[in-house]
Regions:
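His/Asp/Glu-rich mid-to-C-terminal helical/loop segments that flank catalytic regions of hydrolases
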Residues: 37, 102-103, 292, 296-322, ...
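Acidic/His- and Gly-rich active-site-bordering loop/insert found
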Residues: 42-46, 53-149, 168
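Active-site metal-coordination/substrate-binding segment of hydrolases
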Residues: 102-107, 111, 115, 121-214, ...
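Alpha-helical metal-binding/catalytic segments enriched in His/Glu/Asp
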Residues: 139, 148-188, 280-286, 296-318, ...
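Midchain, well-structured core segments that form catalytic/ion-binding scaffolds
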Residues: 186-187, 193-362
Length: 504
């Protein structure tokens, strides 16, 4: 350790010069402060790393203060500490949250870059950070939400990343390489129906032009396109939205609420996420014939709504789901519109969204095969006398989005597991019983970063397993635990990358 002063606390800012200097601004305190590199932190006594902890109150305040940027009529109540939020991507509310992110990270000594899809990268230089092309170790997540969603989904990861930066500054820790926080654009896919859009463009799985031209699907709102809204709110950046031409990422860690019940039911505090299950999104269109509800007998109806209902029931059966149990797959119909939408008119057209998921690519492929069999069966079904049951009706299905099953990096998982054991343990790292390895049921931006850099995720419990809902909740202590695991994971990866020569 290199002692700086024993009678003062200093605020650190960074100068880009060779050799690199720390510029110090003095305030008074009796607390001794030291300046440590990540390597020195690991080389000191074993408890030193464990003493570097985030500020739980500050993290909690950050989470709840960001909830003020919401459409106020979309929350279930007015309590700022419990209400959910609606912060659709590229909305006015999203702009306010983005502005806060930029201003806050700049105040913490970060360089901020915005790319062509609106991803925001805040980078804190490291000891060996003079090369601007050097890839940083990032904590990442998203600030956008679902309509009437929760205040922890995505926000926890961003707030914990900022708390990581604050804690590094508070404790005078100088990382070997640069570290940072990234806010990914349109993770949710609620307003523009391509989830993980920003990270998808960055990774190359989605083309920039396709993303820019995606149209909004928010009911009751004007139709807009992504590029148009990026320009409107001032976040159409100049940096290439590309893993190899834009901001480079050396490793990516994402803290997130579980959004399911497993951790809470088991009494465990941390989920070490090994990967993410496969999923596909479809648009299903059923066409029939509009007719009067009072004058058309049941035998002569081409009722699109009835066929849509039959499709939904049979599609659910594809998963193998049983009452009170499951078959490994998941099917969800989240949006449905019927035309013409009159109470006394038989529906002539129904359009609905379909989300299908499975832990494996093979399992999902089998489900999709059965789905197309179902479409064929409904289009060609016959009654006992051979007359087509659905004459005048048709079912069409279009695949809109696909995400293969993902296995995260072994070395990144190890960083999380070792960090969780240390944070949850008894001072000697024995915290294994309070964590579990698990697979994420939901897609996350880490799916995309995993294509190009070591990636892992950290889960913390969700009350009653509820998410995408105003009642979404994670306790303060669990948020702090996850943030401490995130901090340690980034520091462990920073040392690992230094030891293998990433920063030479």
């Amino acid at each position: 350790m290199r002692a700086l002063w024993t009678s003062s606390v200093y605020k650190v800012t960074y100068a880009r010069s060779k050799p690199r200097l720390a510029l110090l601004t003095k305030s008074f305190s009796s607390t001794p402060y030291y300046k440590l590199t990540t390597t020195e932190l690991f080389q000191s006594n074993k408890s030193s790393l464990g003493k570097i902890k985030i500020n739980p109150d500050r993290l909690w305040d950050t989470i709840h203060s960001t909830a003020k940027w919401t459409e106020p009529k979309k929350v279930s109540n007015d309590d700022i500490n419990t209400a959910g939020l609606t912060r659709l991507t590229l909305s006015n509310e999203d702009k306010l949250a983005r502005d806060w992110f930029v201003e806050t990270t700049k105040s913490l000594g970060c360089q901020v870059h915005v790319d062509q899809i609106g991803n925001i990268f805040a980078i804190r230089p490291g000891l060996r950070g003079e090369n601007e092309d050097m890839s940083a170790t990032f904590a990442g997540s998203h600030l956008d939400s679902q309509p009437s969603g929760g205040r922890f989904d995505g926000v926890l990861g961003i707030a914990a990343g900022i708390e990581m930066l604050r804690t590094l500054n508070d404790n005078w820790i100088e990382t070997e390489g640069p570290v940072g926080v990234v806010n990914w654009t349109n993770e949710e896919g609620a307003r523009y129906p391509i989830s993980m859009m920003g990270s998808g463009v960055w990774s190359g799985r989605i083309s920039l032009d396709d993303a820019w031209s995606t149209k909004s699907v928010s009911p009751g709102r004007p139709v807009t396109m992504v590029k148009q809204e990026l320009e409107r709110i001032g976040y159409l950046g100049a940096s290439p939205a590309s893993y190899n031409k834009g901001v480079r990422i050396g490793a990516h860690f994402e803290l997130h609420i579980e959004q399911g019940p497993k951790l809470e039911k088991s009494g465990q505090k941390v989920g070490v996420v090994e990967g993410v299950q496969a999923y596909k999104w479809f648009t299903v269109t059923v066409t029939g014939r509009e007719a009067h509800a009072g004058t058309t007998d049941m035998a002569n109806r081409f009722d699109a709504m009835h066929t849509a209902a039959e499709f939904m029931v049979e599609a659910r059966a594809i998963t193998g789901a049983q009452p009170g149990g499951g078959g490994g797959g998941l099917v969800t119909f989240g949006r449905l519109t019927a035309s013409p939408g009159s109470v006394n008119t038989i529906a002539g057209k129904v359009e609905m969204s379909l989300d299908m998921r499975s832990p494996s690519d093979q399992g999902l492929a089998k489900m999709v095969g059965k789905l197309y069999d179902l479409v064929d069966r409904l289009n060609n079904a016959a009654t006992k006398n051979g007359k087509p049951l659905h004459s005048g009706l048709g079912v069409e299905i279009r695949e809109d989005f696909s995400s293969a099953a993902v296995k995260f990096s072994t070395e990144a998982i190890r960083c999380v597991e070792e960090s969780a054991a240390a944070v949850l343990g008894d001072g000697h790292g024995h915290g294994e019983k309070t964590m579990q390895r698990m697979t994420s049921g939901a897609g996350h931006d880490s799916v995309c970063t995993n294509m190009h850099c070591p990636t892992a995720m950290i889960f913390v419990p969700s009350k009653d397993g509820v998410s995408h809902n105003p009642s979404e909740w994670t306790d303060k202590e669990d948020c702090a635990t996850g943030a401490n695991v995130l901090l340690q994971s980034v520091l462990r990866m920073d040392k690992l990358r230094k030891d293998r020569g990433d920063f030479e």
